Amino acid sequence: MKLSNFWIRTLTGILFLVIMVFGIIWDRAIFTCLFGIILTVALGEFYKMALGTRFRFQQRLGVMTGIAAFLLVAAYCFFGWDLRWLVIALIPLLLIPVSCLFLPSREGFGDLAYIYAGLLYIALPISLSPLLMMDGDVYDGWFLLSLFIMIWCSDVGAYCIGTAFGQKPNSRKLAPSISPKKSWWGFWGGLFFCVGAAIGLHYLTWLPFPLLHCIVLGLIVGAGGVCGDLFESIWKRHFGVKDSGNCIPGHGGMLDRFDSSLVAIPLAFVYLALIDLI
């Protein structure tokens, strides 16, 4: 019997949720493998959207740079490697311009900038994630999981409130030229759910910060998640695609699932670093 798209989307979503929770909290090696795969697939999707089959060798060098940077940051955080090992990630990065000297044609040469754009947009935020995973010498994935829970709650709130109130003819759209279905109702609903999740996680002690900072964190993560979602929508409109890929049945590509976190989690990291809480 053929499953409907609703059930495919639901079952895939549950499986995705289980893998994410298990991969984040269980063990540092499992986390490293999981997020290494996420980075590789998401970056590959971005390069495929932007460049197609052009500059394939340079695309591979870009993916190698991203995964090397992530693995070396993880090795520094989890296993005490010297941070100077990060220079290894410079090898494939520097090979990108060198390899361009041997291109048979310079047509579309400016599009090579997408290689570096993908590293800044995808590889850099994911490479920051191991820095949030240690409590002294003890591996602790609950904080990063809490940030993802806040993002997921924001998505649920935006969908529920936006569907209930934001699709009426007179409702104001958030960014109609980028994502016509998103409304201000959905934005405020997502923000409310995100802050509510942050407060709940604070009382569960998963967010070990003063309540005021948890509320601010909820606002930052909620707003940052919307920015990440809209930013990916701009890319997809620019490249003329509906989804970044199809590796997650019913949900599109890997980049579609992590677009919010690519902005929200780095913003949370910067905020907590500035107030000296991490």
Regions found by a protein language model. Give the residues of each.
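Membrane-embedded alpha-helical bundles of polytopic integral membrane proteins
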Residues: 1-220
